[in-house]
Amino acid sequence: MTSYKALGLVNTKDLFAKAVKGGYAIPAYNFNNLEQLQAIIQACVETRSPVILQVSSGARKYANATLLRNMARGAVEYAHELGVDIPIVLHLDHGDSLELCIDCIESGFSSVMIDGSALPYDENVALSRKVCEYAHARADYVTVEGELGVLAGVEDDVVAEKSHYTMPDEVEDFVKKTGVDSLAISIGTSHGRAKFTPEQCTRNADGVLIPPPLRFDILAEIEKRIPGFPIVLHGASSVPVEYVREVERYGGNLPDSVGIPEEQLRKAAKSAVCKVNIDSDGRLAMTAAIRRVLTTKVDEFDPRKYLGPARDELKKLYMHKNKEVLGSAGRA
């Protein structure tokens, strides 16, 4: 059994309180390998941003729980080596059972998400409450994220064909009965790189898909019901057109790719939304760089020669997110 404090990690309690008050959001970047972790820490150190290292159950299986725990410890030491002790959270993304959440907590996670959003309301409440009871009883308080509403799309093992918006009249009851520390809501974001169908979008003069706007009216109503409570946005990648085109230029095929416009994320970050999840953008940035290297240098076979540029592109992207989108730069 490992305490997250022994790894140098923090939970989200104070970070979220400061973010809500300060009108910015903390980045939650998914990772499952060394290069992704290097890019995240470098970007957040250089922008002086707190960060949530986010791991899905699939990523945890891929990376191995023991290696992952030590990667998190290494991330803290690496940031210190780079000269800035930024706050770092290790968070389970989309935990689907009490057992998984307990396993992650006991292996050093400082925050977990229990996703019972696909369950009937009462079952979601009961499951989320059990996770909170365990996490909050620890000597080192572990924070818990719950979810109301369902996001469409695919993210590792999480699959949903249709979105179901969060119902504002449920949030106060849910938060009170479960004891969750933050709440993921559904206001129009989706998982994956094709967040909307072409039929849901319009097109600009260049033929680029323009998605429908987020439901800020739902967010505003939720904020009225639970003022100051930390809100989380999943599926918040912007799916930059330049990365999609780069992937396709070098042999990929990513039809109908569309994400959440950054101006809408900026607006959300100034509200009670204090955690914004970004995964697909990172995948696109790395894949574009890797395809470019392997296509233009056909004799290259040293992984460092294509994973290095992928890491550098990811760092560049995340520095932009921290500084220009989420407002987390300078908040460490």
UniProtKB/Swiss-Prot annotation:
Where is Zn(2+) 1 annotated to bind? 94, 191, 234
Pfam families reported in the protein's UniProt record: F_bP_aldolase
Catalytic activity, as annotated = beta-D-fructose 1,6-bisphosphate = D-glyceraldehyde 3-phosphate + dihydroxyacetone phosphate
Gene3D superfamilies noted in UniProt: Aldolase class I
Q: Where does dihydroxyacetone phosphate bind?
A: 192, 235-237, 277-280
Enzyme Commission code: 4.1.2.13
Pathway(s) per entry: Carbohydrate degradation; glycolysis; D-glyceraldehyde 3-phosphate and glycerone phosphate from D-glucose: step 4/4
Do the record's keywords include Zinc? Answer: yes
What positions constitute the catalytic site?
93 (proton donor)
What does the record note about the cofactor? Binds 2 Zn(2+) ions per subunit. One is catalytic and the other provides a structural contribution.
Domain of life according to the entry: Bacteria
Molecular function as annotated in GO: fructose-bisphosphate aldolase activity; zinc ion binding
Q: Which residues of the sequence carry a binding annotation for D-glyceraldehyde 3-phosphate?
A: 56
> Which InterPro entries does the protein's record reference?
Aldolase_TIM, Class_II_FBP_aldolase, FBA_II, Fruc_bis_ald_class-2
**What's this protein's family per the entry?**
Belongs to the class II fructose-bisphosphate aldolase family.
Q: How does it assemble?
A: Homodimer.
Recorded protein name is Fructose-bisphosphate aldolase
